[in-house]
């Protein structure tokens, strides 16, 4: 049953959404990193999908207890690789490892801004695998991703903000000999896996970056993610 909980980060308590699989644990865990819209209903849906697949899903609210200025700071951190949000993500991973209903094998998944965090957390923290969904890729990816966990990533070819990122990531991970599965979907744009209720304020932005949920591409992306996580997180427990 999903619930809201609080967990200790470096300097404060943070809220989080937790989705538990059915049946008896322990289960492998996944930290679910939100997009710029925050801990939305959509991010809860992503966590629920992971729980249905047998993963203890933990989605921290990186905006907890901070004002509107934290949104800009958190967005910048997802690209720079520096900032308090990374400490919060590591605290989330640690929270999972301390639970009796978790095997201690933890993955990370992120969407948009969260995809950037997932990518740069892969070489930094002890994650067994990472799923990057339309997250930015730094130009110096070869330097920044050395020692990263295996990575599965999905991008939309029609995303005007992230042109060439799928190929940049593919090139870097190949050079580093890091196991990966990178796919660029030809007919979709940004956030194609997310059901976003944009409203009047964000509506123009969603049109600019072609943010439209696409069911066939989403189904294929989730199939790849779960196959990848099963191989690198779940099967490693056997």
Please annotate each region the language model reported:
Residues 46, 163-173:
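Short alpha-helix in the alpha/beta-hydrolase fold that links the catalytic acid
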Residues 179-238:
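C-terminal catalytic histidine-bearing segment of alpha/beta-hydrolase fold enzymes
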Residues 152-155, 185:
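Short beta-strand/loop motif that positions the catalytic acidic residue
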Residues 157-163, 190-191:
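Acidic catalytic loop of the alpha/beta-hydrolase fold
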């Amino acid at each position: 049953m999903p619930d809201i909980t609080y967990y200790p980060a470096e300097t404060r308590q943070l809220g989080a959404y937790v989705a538990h699989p059915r049946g008896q644990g322990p289960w492998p865990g996944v930290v679910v990193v939100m997009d710029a819209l925050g801990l939305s209903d959509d991010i809860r849906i992503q966590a629920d999908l992971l729980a249905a697949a047998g993963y203890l899903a933990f989605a921290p609210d990186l905006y907890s207890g901070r004002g509107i200025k934290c949104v800009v700071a958190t967005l910048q951190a997802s690209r720079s690789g520096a900032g308090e949000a990374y400490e919060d993500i590591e605290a989330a991973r640690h929270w999972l490892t301390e639970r009796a209903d978790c095997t201690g094998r933890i993955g990370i998944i992120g969407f948009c801004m969260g995809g950037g965090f997932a990518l740069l957390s892969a070489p930094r923290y002890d994650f067994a695998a990472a799923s990057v969904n339309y997250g930015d890729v730094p130009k110096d990816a070869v330097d920044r991703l050395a020692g990263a966990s295996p990575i599965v990533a999905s991008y939309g070819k029609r995303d005007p903000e992230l042109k060439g990122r799928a190929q940049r990531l593919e090139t870097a991970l190949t050079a580093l000999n890091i196991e990966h599965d990178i796919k660029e979907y030809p007919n979709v744009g940004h956030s194609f896996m997310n059901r976003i209720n944009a409203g009047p304020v964000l509506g123009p932005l969603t049109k600019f970056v072609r943010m439209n949920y696409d069911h066939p591409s989403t189904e294929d992306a989730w199939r790849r993610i779960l196959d990848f996580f099963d191989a690198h997180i779940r099967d490693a427990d056997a």
